[in-house]
């Protein structure tokens, strides 16, 4: 969005989201916590806005990486904490998508990591409003792990090192793709600890859009959700909603 357009002025954009968190204080995981976190989000509907065609101004949820759920999808990931994952928005055009993936692979491998798997995130494309559907990107989940020959650190050291590398990789990818002007590209998250599901949705649409979130084998112990404050900024499908810092 331009710095100034009509009555809109970017100088007045700021975060004032409705946020919530659900935690199992005993550390246990369950799908019930996913359901409860989504209920918290849905109860913040008054914090957001939507158009006549039911296009929302953004909503999202951040949870721990559901390691067991990922294994059940047949994805051969390493041990918990020894790989990173994240949801990525990609353009639907195959040529642009391949260009972005090549850049991602280059930057991932620069840090001794490898893109080990690319998963199509199951979504219900009938859920978002008309305007959101018109700009909907391809939604993928990437899995990144250290190259086997370089994975020699202890589990604790590797987790800290991997998280730092994933942050650097994400920033380098974003810097390289930004000048290309590809609006439909966005990395929702890239971490060895947490994963973010978000988009240009209402708080009530998130659950129905991302089918992972209603899978009974998707278990978490902590969930944080966000619903932007009405009229605080102009929404875009790529960015969706803002979210709190990473969960502990």
Regions found by a protein language model. Name each.
Residues 1-247:
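N-terminal segments that mediate ammonia production and transfer
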């Amino acid at each position: 969005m331009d710095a100034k357009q009509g009555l809109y002025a970017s100088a007045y954009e700021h975060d004032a989201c409705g946020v919530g968190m659900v935690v199992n204080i005993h550390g246990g995981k369950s799908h019930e916590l996913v359901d409860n976190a989504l209920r918290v989000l849905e109860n913040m509907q008054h914090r957001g806005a939507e158009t006549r065609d039911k296009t929302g101004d953004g909503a999202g949820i951040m949870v721990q990486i559901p390691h067991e759920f990922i294994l059940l999808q047949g994805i051969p990931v390493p041990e918990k904490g020894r790989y990173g994952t994240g949801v990525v928005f990609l353009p639907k055009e195959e040529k642009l998508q391949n260009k972005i993936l090549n850049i991602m692979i280059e930057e991932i491998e620069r840090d001794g990591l490898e893109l080990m798997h690319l998963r199509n995130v199951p979504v219900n494309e009938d859920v978002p409003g008309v305007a959101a559907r018109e700009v909907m990107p391809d939604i993928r989940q990437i899995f990144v792990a250290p190259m086997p020959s370089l994975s020699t650190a202890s589990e604790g050291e590797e987790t800290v090192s991997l998280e730092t590398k994933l942050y650097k990789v994400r920033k380098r990818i974003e810097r390289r793709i930004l000048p290309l002007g590809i609006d439909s590209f966005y990395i929702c998250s890239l971490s060895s600890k947490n994963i973010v599901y978000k988009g240009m949705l209402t708080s009530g649409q998130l659950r129905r859009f991302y089918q992972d979130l209603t899978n009974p084998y998707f278990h978490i112990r902590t969930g944080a959700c966000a619903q932007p404050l009405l009229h605080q900024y102009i929404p875009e499908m790529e960015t969706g909603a803002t979210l709190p810092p990473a969960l502990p």
